[in-house]
Design a protein with these regions (language model features):
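Charge-rich, low-complexity N-terminal segments
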Residues: 2-95
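Well-ordered beta-strand positions
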Residues: 75-77, 99, 147-148
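Short, well-ordered loop/turn elements at secondary-structure boundaries
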Residues: 78-79, 117-118, 149-150
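Hydrophobic residues embedded in beta-strands of well-ordered beta-sheets
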Residues: 81-83, 105-106, 154
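Structured beta-strand/loop patches that form or line metal/cofactor-binding pockets in enzymes
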Residues: 87-144
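A hydrophobic, small-residue-rich beta->alpha segment in the mid-to-C-terminal subdomain
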Residues: 142-186
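Cysteine/selenocysteine-centered motifs that mediate thiol-based redox chemistry or coordinate metal-sulfur cofactors
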Residues: 182-211
Length: 211
């Protein structure tokens, strides 16, 4: 009986032990026995800034947001935009892109190395594309992407990153609104053309060619 009364008096202390300081907390933790160390909560990476990339047609190079200069195999300038083909990434993936100032997207087809397969056919990055010289272009990527499975679906990605960048002051409200409106227009256009990127762009008098 005495033992039961003692344990009943200790139970609240045992429960509260992690938050109790001084001798009471010390003895409560001793009674409970050793506890596993607290698990560190992973911290989210800081919000990023819009990624700016430059394309030098004369030099056959591109310069990414970190300042790395990479070779480009081929450029082609058309009235509706700029085409480029290049090798990117550690897996030596081959990539073809069209930078399209109107409707404000970068359309990418990636040719993966053997053993790697993507679940989508196109990625449409929502971007600001500007021609800043006779042979020089700039694309500003504000995080939103649309992954397209031809004839099946279009999925918006990156909204959380854009909102985090806006909250951190890296992107003003007008720019964030413009990116979301542009993404909505892309999704609506694709839905109206059976999720076919080529058909949607042809309806806008944009004819893409690929390797």
């Amino acid at each position: 009986m005495v033992k039961d009364k003692a344990m009943s008096a200790l139970l609240p202390l045992l429960v509260a032990a992690p938050a109790v300081t001084g001798f009471a907390g010390y003895f409560a933790r001793e009674i409970r026995g050793p506890q596993p160390p607290p698990v560190a909560t992973p911290t989210a990476p800081p919000p990023g800034r819009p990624r700016v990339e430059f394309f030098d047609v004369a030099e056959l190079t591109s310069t990414d947001a970190r300042g790395f200069i990479r070779p480009v195999d081929r450029y082609e300038v058309q009235p509706w935009g700029l085409y480029l083909a290049r090798t990117v990434g550690a897996r030596a993936r081959y990539e073809e892109c069209w930078l399209l100032p109107e409707p404000g997207v970068r359309a990418t087809v990636a040719h993966d190395s053997p053993g790697h397969h993507r679940s989508h056919d196109y990625v449409l990055d929502i971007v600001e594309v500007e021609r800043i010289g006779p042979k020089r272009w700039r694309a500003t990527d504000c995080f939103l992407d649309v992954a397209v499975r031809r004839g099946r679906s279009a999925t918006l990605l990156g909204a959380g990153e854009l909102l985090a960048a806006h909250a951190a002051g890296h992107l003003d409200t007008a720019s964030a609104d413009r990116m979301f409106e542009r993404a909505a227009a892309v999704l609506d256009g694709l839905a109206a053309h059976d999720h076919d990127v080529e058909r949607w762009l042809r309806a806008r008098d944009i004819a893409l060619t690929w390797m």
